[in-house]
Amino acid sequence: MSAGEAFAGGVAVVTGAGSGLGAGLARHASGLGMTVVLADIDGAAAARVAEELRAAGGSAVDVVCDVRDPDAVQDLAERVYRDVGAVRLLVNNAGVEQFGYLWDTPVANWQRTIDINVSGVFYGVRAFLPKMMATDERAWVWNVASVGAVVAIPLQAPYIVSKHAVLALTECLYLEVESTGHANHIHVQVVLPGPVSSSIFESAGGIDANGDVVAAEAQRSAMLDLKATAMDPTDAAGALFQQAIDGRFYLHTHPDAVGAAMAERADVLASQRSPALRTQSRFDTTKR
């Protein structure tokens, strides 16, 4: 079965759809013939992408939604099922970054990262999945983690913690769906993207002036350097949709680099050795 055959005519809900990977996923879903609900805290950004999709002949609805608010996410689910239709694809994508040493991280920034990156995924699952399971129709739940879900990186601890949590949440959810007899029609998958063009690093939280701002901004700069070779979001989306149809649990944008990171993580755990600082980016292919 092709992605077009699986998804055409269905409804996709994408959080964080106003930019980056979320916008790419929305564009690709629309290209497959899906009605796309674009949810974002930045209503203007979601509206721009939705208008682009409509101008190209697609069906799109933009909604302002703060995934930190469980009531807002529940209301989104109720509105979608009432006004648009049953959801075939739920993408819990909204996320933020955070730079700086953990001891320099403002409590508010820690909470923001966890609230959006982890609780936002939970709220999405809690609001939509019971409705998706209530029918026998095939449906997909994608929770967007990161290659950061299988690595340890200094100066990005809140983000890395949050993505490890999303991976664990999705693994548990997969087993719960299976144990309740819904795995024949509900497909739970985790997305582990590598560098994809977005503004996540520019909008990342920083630290207070009395912390090591130089170190925090150096890490931001290092991550921004990845943008030079980052994947186009729409290209990334195409790869993810195909992998989803192939039945994979782990969906990758950079299979070689992410696969190597997963193998490295497995080796660290199996050998029970301490984490090791890296001297180069895992996405630098020039030195392999």
Each model region followed by its residue ranges:
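Canonical Rossmann dinucleotide-binding motif of NAD(H)/NADP(H)-dependent dehydrogenases/reductases
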Residues: 2-37
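Substrate-binding pocket helix/loop in short-chain dehydrogenase/reductase
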Residues: 101-102, 109-111
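Active-site helix of classical SDR
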Residues: 125, 162
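SDR active-site lid
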Residues: 179-254
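The beta1-alpha1 cofactor-binding region of Rossmann-like NAD(H)/NADP(H)-dependent oxidoreductases
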Residues: 43-44, 64-75, 107
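Conserved glycine-rich Rossmann-like NAD(P)H-binding loop of the short-chain dehydrogenase/reductase
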Residues: 32-48
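Residue(s) in the substrate-gating loop at a strand-loop-helix junction
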Residues: 146
